[in-house]
């Protein structure tokens, strides 16, 4: 009888210990440094896509701001807020190379599309976004698809915007978003605005070339001038 009771106690301890170990392992996996860092990077990327620049800066402040990955997002956020020249020297950014990512990386092309869009280079923004979609193992993502629709609409390429809308319409979580964009496209169709055109070819491998072309297109481009200064 005592052996039987001892066995029951051991089984009870095991049944309690195993879930606790599983919870502990799960907490470690979620809150370990590599995973926290990845979550912060994804958060910065998402906030930048949504143009929530204060949240971009706030997230970077809670991370390692000396990490080179954050510097392009940091400078873009400061530039979009119009405070880049005044605030940049408060951060450990020491090279002009830190304003841009290599174009042959998925994360790089995704950011570079935001960078080009901020400079007013819409076609280059679309080109970089297409590059990001082509490099992604999952193909089109919802966030990049939404940007394609908005940017094509702004560029006046409404038929292509509608094609991307047709793709997004197959999802089940964008009904309200699609309704709003459909109304926007319908209003755009009633105007006679010409599609946006860039009459130059851009070497997107160099941010300085992008900045130079942006200033050539508009010598009062404050965002491009702030980057150069």
What are these regions (language model features)?
Residues 1-7:
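Membrane-embedded alpha-helical segments of integral membrane proteins
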Residues 30-200, 204, 208, 214-228:
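Soluble catalytic regions of membrane-associated enzymes that act on cell-envelope
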